[in-house]
Amino acid sequence: MEKSVNVIGAGLAGSEAAWQLVKRGVKVDLYEMRPVKQTPAHHTDKFAELVCTNSLRANGLTNAVGVIKEEMRILDSIIIEAADKASVPAGGALAVDRHEFSGYITDKVKNHPLVTVHTEEVTTIPEGPTIIATGPLTSPALADEIKQLTGEEYLYFYDAAAPIIEKDSIDMDKVYLKSRYDKGEAAYLNCPMSEEEFNAFYEALVTAETAALKEFEKEVFFEGCMPIEVMAKRGIKTMLFGPLKPVGLEDPKTGKRPYAVLQLRQDDAAGTLYNMVGFQTHLKWGEQKRVFGMIPGLENAEIVRYGVMHRNTFINSPTVLEPTYQLKTRNDLFFAGQMTGVEGYVESAASGLAAGINAANFVEEKELVVFPAETAIGSLAHYITSASKKSFQPMNVNFGLFPELETKIRAKQERNEKLAERALNAIKRVAEEL
């Protein structure tokens, strides 16, 4: 019997997943509702339409997103092949002519003899091997189906995330490890502020520029998740009873309670990343770096994921997904793209690549691939399936997700080069075994 897989959604992840399947001789039924039913963000009927920027970000190997793109090239990614062919001058970044980019992918995928395209909205999850790659604007009917499958509490409709910081960039001389009232183990890094420091920070925060909202995002805001800058505008003391509450956080150096305290909570199993507790924000990225850099200890903080608040549909992957992108409760069902909690065009495509390879292996009754954590593709899969279940938020690829090198290297560029070299050696070994 001919082996086949349903792929729902022909965005970046779905197109990549479909390509990886047909490359391995597996028939694909590809479902895409556009143009029969449009989303509020898409404008064409093309596959892998880029709805926001035309940049796929940095190309160099001293940047994690450059490494993931190189890994994808090694694994014959259709998305990266299209991007390389449609590239436009952009300095050290990979930017594309968006029409040429999506046109190339549409042509290659649609016209492949093993692909059957169904232009219709999917409202029920089909039987049999399936990849769901319906993106951040998944239609309500299908979102309801996913909710039934994963459990209501594990599907989210908007993304409200605080910035995440690389631990190595925090000034440890200015912060201290402590939990409020010393309850349990000392689990938080605390950034103490004097009244003068707090007042200066407050003034900068309430006058900082916020990012513009897209029309289709406006209804999702403030459902019990208020941006820090909105909270601050309610009064100078409001944050002191919220995320900057100093009670129970006496500074062990002075024995006194600071005027205000920001807590940083460990965000990954390896303890290399920390998030700013309660600091979900809609400030522009440059403003986040400037304003949050006024907090003692964070003057030179390396923000690996800026705070965002936007419309998104994603599952609680640490609870419901395997590192192979399979649903824990139904092993012939895979998820890919932003729906899984990976953030960004390239990351979405990379998850589609991994899901496509694994869905092909599943129908061929071969062993599924868990990408090594030292690869960029593997580090993302590892993060989204092992991050905190309670505070899970989508994540871009970054070197903070990679396991540390055996030998510690202080110089950032050299460290990144070594991480990249290790990642590419590992992905080549994976490619040889596929």
UniProtKB/Swiss-Prot annotation:
PROSITE patterns: GIDA_2 (PS01281). Keywords: Cytoplasm, FAD, Flavoprotein, Methyltransferase, NAD, NADP, Transferase, tRNA processing. One of its GO terms (biological process) is tRNA wobble uridine modification. GO terms for molecular function: flavin adenine dinucleotide binding; tRNA (uracil(54)-C5)-methyltransferase activity, 5,10-methylenetetrahydrofolate-dependent. FAD binds at residues 9-14. It is an enzyme of class 2 (transferase). Its cofactor is FAD. It catalyses: uridine(54) in tRNA + (6R)-5,10-methylene-5,6,7,8-tetrahydrofolate + NADH + H(+) = 5-methyluridine(54) in tRNA + (6S)-5,6,7,8-tetrahydrofolate + NAD(+); uridine(54) in tRNA + (6R)-5,10-methylene-5,6,7,8-tetrahydrofolate + NADPH + H(+) = 5-methyluridine(54) in tRNA + (6S)-5,6,7,8-tetrahydrofolate + NADP(+). Signal peptide: none annotated. Pfam families: GIDA. InterPro entries: FAD/NAD-bd_sf, MnmG-rel, MnmG-rel_CS, MnmG_N, TrmFO. One of its GO terms (cellular component) is cytosol. Its EC number is 2.1.1.74. It is found in: Cytoplasm. PANTHER family: GLUCOSE INHIBITED DIVISION PROTEIN A, METHYLENETETRAHYDROFOLATE--TRNA-(URACIL-5-)-METHYLTRANSFERASE TRMFO. Catalyzes the folate-dependent formation of 5-methyl-uridine at position 54 (M-5-U54) in all tRNAs. Belongs to the MnmG family. TrmFO subfamily. This is Methylenetetrahydrofolate--tRNA-(uracil-5-)-methyltransferase TrmFO. It comes from Listeria monocytogenes serotype 4b (strain F2365).
